[in-house]
Structures are given as C-alpha cells and as structure tokens.
C-alpha cells in the first residue's frame, strides 16, 4: 500500500526530529543565549531536503552556497551525534536518492527491509535507542500510522514496540485507526483494529479530549458489530469524555438500535447526564419510536425532566416522537417556566415550524407574555421568521396581544421592518386610530399606520349588495360567499390598494382557482351521465358543497 510506504518513512523521520527537539530543549536554558555551530557541509543536496529541514528552524540553521551546497548549523553540541545520525542514516542526505526524495517512487524502496533495519540495528546511538523504548511518551511513529498494510504493524509489534504509545494529543494507534476510519477501506481498518485489540491495546486509554477508543468507536459512523462486541467485553461502558458523553450517549445519537440494546443489556447507565444535562434517552428520542420503546421497556427507571425533554424534542422538530410520548403519558406539553415561557413559545424561539403547527392544533393558546415582555409574535420578528409569523397571524391573535407584541418589537433598535408592518397591517383592521397610534415607539411608522386606516375606511364605505368590502376581505371565511361577491367590479378595483391590495388579490386568486376546479369536475361528470341533464346553476350549487381538496381529489379519480 503506497500510502503506508510514505507514512512509515515520513513518521520515522519525524520521530527522530522530535527526539532531537526534546533533547535540545532539555540541554538549553532560557537565560543563556546560544550560538549556532557548524555541524556539517553537504554537496549535491536535493532541494526537497532543504525545504524539509527549513520547516525546523529551532533545530537547524541552513545556509546555501552556490548550487546544492548546504551548510547545516545547530545550537546543540551535546546532541551532535544524534543530529548527524538523523542526517546521514535516516535522511541519507549524502547519497543520491534520499528517502524523502523517493517517497513518491515507492516501488524503488524496500520498506520491509527498512523496518527490519530500523528495529534490528545494533549500532544505534543510545539517544536514538531511547526513542524505541516501550512506554516512553514520545511522538512514537507507530501511533501515527493512519492506514497501513498489517504485516508491517505485526513486524513492529513483534520487535517490542509499545502498542499503546501516545502522541502529543494522547492518541494511541488504536485511537488513530478509529479517528481516520474510512468505510471505503473498512476491511483493512477492521483487520488492523482487531490485531491491536488482540494484542492487548487498551480500549479505555483516554486522549487529551477524554476520548477512549471505545467512545470513538461509538461516536464515529462505524457499524461493525464484531469490533463493537470485542471492545464491549473489555471496555468501561460508562466512561465519559471531556463533555460528559458516554458510549450510550453516542450510539443513541447515531440511532444504532442494536448497539443501544447491547449496552443497556450490559448495564450501561441510562440516566448519566453530560455537561449539558442530557441523558442517553434524550439523545435517542429524536430519531423515532423504536429507540423510545427500547428505553421505556428497559428494567431501569428513567429520570424524566419534563420541561427539558419537551424542549429537546422541539429543538429537533421531532413531532412524531413528541406525539408518541404524549400518547404514552411520559411528558406534558402544558408547562410554564419561571419566565412564563410555554412549549409554543419554545417552538417559536427555536424556529421549529412543524412542532409549532402541531402544538397550535393541539393547544391553541399562544397568547403568553414572558416576564421580559416578549410574546410569540415578537419572538418570531426577532428571529426574522416570516413563515412562523404568518402561521401565528392565521390563528387570529387578540388586539391586546398584538399591541403588546408591537411594543416588545419596537423596544429593540434593530428589528425586521417588514415583519413589524405585517403586525401593524393585521392590527389596523381590528382597532381604531387612537389605540394604535398612541404607542409612542410607532411614531416613525405613523405614515404607514395612516395609510392602513385610510384604506380600511375606504373599504368600510363601499357596499356590494348588503356587505361592505371590509366585511368581505376581513370577516368572511366562507369561500362560496366570497365567490358570489368577489367577481363584482367594485370588489376587483381594490386590488390596487397599496397595503391591503395583496389580500384582495389573494381572495380573487382563490375564487378563480375554485371556479376552475368546479368547471373541470362538472365537464368530467357530463360525459355519459345523467348529470348532463342538470342546469349549470344546479351543478354549481351541488359542487360548491365540496372544499378545494375534495374537488382536486375527485378530479384525479375520475
């Protein structure tokens, strides 16, 4: 595997460099200014070598003279032998075709022979040998091999390399294999992980983030049941990472039903809370009913924080899970926090559209006022969410809540002007001039409010038969009534209004759509049927009893 050939050489070089850096830092003191000393001069050095060494300015001072003549200086006399070993034996800097230069030409390198040479070399400097001792906390190159041919790992293990050596992040090779697991190469990774586990690699060893290999296996998208069961036999199933997540948290988040079942059957704590107060049950319920049933049917009693769990479901817009938990009597959506916030207010706050519609249909009371003076409507404006604003206004909020919402909106220096105008536009048709204009913070919108009232007054003064245009636009919900009046020229002319013209246009569009449905269905029924004998007026009267959805359905069927 070409990647392995490049990786083993690259990290053996880095290993040497990190040992040198460690030795230099130990031998120098901060209050002594040291000078660079010439170590060696090399000729015909490949530019790749120069670029590589330049990445380590704290170790090497490099001067180039002429073409490919390299003078290398260092501050550390005590470790000169180690540095020379690195330059001559590891980099092969004096020979044509150094290891670095040939990394891309993997066919010309006998990696197996190089590994044997490295581990069997009897003439290694003592400093170099220290890097290969078991258990030493260095940047051990074994712990950096991310993808490999497993025979080379076996060679290294058989020569006594410490299998759980860690890098500066506290990661072992087992950590690294799981971190960089690729589904496309899962067979190679699975084999290597099994080799490491069978050779006693510690599944509970934590890196600097508190991740054990077993936690990583649960956290990442690895669905290998065999690896999971091997780790499960030796792992601490309730170990936690830096954020307090356990393996059960992660497999629940990933919706891995079989892994959750195995951990629960092994006695994993289902009530462990992470630093955010979330239990594994909370992580699992957002995915659907199957995991909920598994937790509810377990022998352990679940700790349920009603407000927390409902808000968790709202954040993820998990309507199906909420509905099932309500059906089972596990939760209650009719709560009020100490700030007078309700479940509907939370749905608006987190922009959970589907959850909001569900809660409004189940419990329509959304006219709550929080202790800070916010309402659901003012929160929708603060979130710049026009869709949720339209849903709330369609539920016909009261004049009181609209005035309070407008006051709350205008308290903020930055607010969505268009959404505020939607509120004013809705409120203007419910109130009189004095009630609305007295809101001091609305003075900058006075011209818009006056425009709203002017258009409303015009519509109130215009009658079509026994109804005003205002009644038809704002008070009439029956579509058939609107069909009788909406085609009148006096109604159509109000489509040109600046503020409420769009509302009139929407009504006319709905009328035309319904007329088209009725006409198409009537024609379909005419073919080969006694229906054709009825007068058109009778046909229309009959079909008017169906709503638009029913008319559309019949058209599809016929």
From Swiss-Prot:
Keyword annotations of the record: ANK repeat, Repeat
Pfam families: Ank_2, PRANC
SMART domains in UniProt: ANK (SM00248)
Protein's UniProt keywords contain Repeat: yes
ANK repeat placement: 65-95, 169-205, 209-239, 243-272, 276-304, 339-368, 372-401
Keyword set includes Nucleotide-binding: no
Gene3D superfamilies in the cross-refs: Ankyrin repeat-containing domain
Tree of life domain: Viruses
Family stated for the protein in its record: Belongs to the orthopoxvirus OPG189 protein family.
Functional description taken from the UniProt entry: Contributes to viral release without involving rearrangement of host actin.
Protein name per the record: Ankyrin repeat protein OPG189
Biological source species: Variola virus (isolate Human/India/Ind3/1967) (VARV)
UniProt lineage: Viruses, Varidnaviria, Bamfordvirae, Nucleocytoviricota, Pokkesviricetes
Gene that this sequence comes from: OPG189
């Amino acid at each position: 595997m070409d990647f392995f050939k490049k990786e083993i050489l690259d990290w053996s070089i880095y290993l040497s460099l990190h040992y040198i850096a460690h030795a230099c830092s130990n031998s120098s003191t901060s209050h002594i200014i040291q000078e660079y000393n010439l170590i060696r001069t090399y000729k015909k050095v490949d530019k790749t070598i120069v670029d590589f060494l330049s990445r380590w300015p704290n170790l090497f001072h490099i001067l180039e003279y002429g073409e490919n003549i390299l003078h290398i200086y260092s501050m550390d006399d005590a470790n000169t032998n180690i540095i020379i070993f690195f330059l001559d034996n590891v980099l092969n800097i004096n020979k044509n075709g150094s290891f670095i230069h040939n990394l891309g030409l993997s066919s010309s390198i006998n990696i197996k022979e190089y590994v044997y040479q490295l581990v069997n070399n009897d003439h290694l400097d003592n400093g170099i040998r220290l890097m290969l001792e078991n258990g030493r906390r260095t940047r051990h190159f074994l712990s950096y091999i991310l993808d490999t041919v497993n025979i080379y790992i076996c060679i290294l293990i058989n020569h006594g390399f410490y299998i759980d050596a860690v890098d500066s992040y506290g990661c072992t090779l087992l950590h690294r294999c799981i971190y960089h697991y690729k589904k496309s190469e899962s067979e190679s990774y699975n084999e290597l992980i099994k080799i490491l586990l069978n050779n006693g690699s510690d599944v509970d060893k934590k890196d600097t983030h508190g991740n054990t290999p077993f936690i990583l296996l649960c956290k990442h998208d690895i669905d290998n049941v065999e690896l999971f069961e091997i780790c499960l036999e030796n792992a601490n199933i309730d170990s936690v990472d830096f954020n307090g997540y356990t393996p059960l948290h992660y497999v629940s988040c990933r919706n891995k039903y079989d892994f959750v079942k195995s951990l629960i059957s092994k006695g994993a704590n289902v009530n462990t809370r992470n630093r955010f107060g979330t239990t594994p049950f909370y992580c699992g319920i957002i995915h659907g009913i199957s995991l909920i049933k598994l937790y509810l049917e377990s022998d352990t009693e679940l700790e349920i924080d009603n407000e927390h769990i409902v808000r968790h479901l709202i954040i993820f817009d998990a309507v199906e899970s909420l509905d099932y938990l309500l059906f089972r009597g596990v939760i209650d959506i009719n709560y009020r926090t100490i700030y007078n916030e309700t479940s509907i207010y939370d749905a608006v706050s987190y922009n959970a559209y589907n959850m909001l519609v569900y809660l409004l249909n189940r419990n329509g009371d959304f006219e709550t006022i929080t202790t800070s003076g916010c309402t659901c409507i003012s929160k929708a404006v603060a979130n710049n969410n026009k869709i949720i604003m339209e849903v709330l206004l369609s539920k016909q909020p009261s004049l009181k809540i609209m005035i309070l919402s407008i006051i709350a909106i205008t308290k903020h220096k930055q607010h969505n002007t268009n959404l505020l105008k939607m509120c004013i536009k809705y409120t203007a048709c419910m109130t009189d001039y004095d009630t609305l204009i007295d809101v001091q913070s609305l003075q900058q919108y006075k011209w818009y409010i006056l425009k709203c009232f002017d258009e409303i007054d015009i519509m109130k003064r215009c009658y079509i038969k026994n109804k005003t245009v205002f009644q038809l636009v704002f008070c009439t919900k029956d579509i058939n009534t609107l069909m009788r009046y909406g085609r009148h020229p006096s109604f159509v002319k109000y489509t040109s209004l600046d503020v409420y013209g769009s509302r009139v246009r929407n009504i006319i569009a709905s009328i035309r759509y319904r007329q088209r449905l009725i006409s198409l269905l009537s024609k379909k029924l005419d073919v080969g049927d006694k229906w054709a004998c009825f007068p058109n007026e009778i046909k229309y009267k009959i079909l008017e009893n169906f709503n638009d959805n029913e008319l559309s359905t019949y058209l599809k069927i016929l």
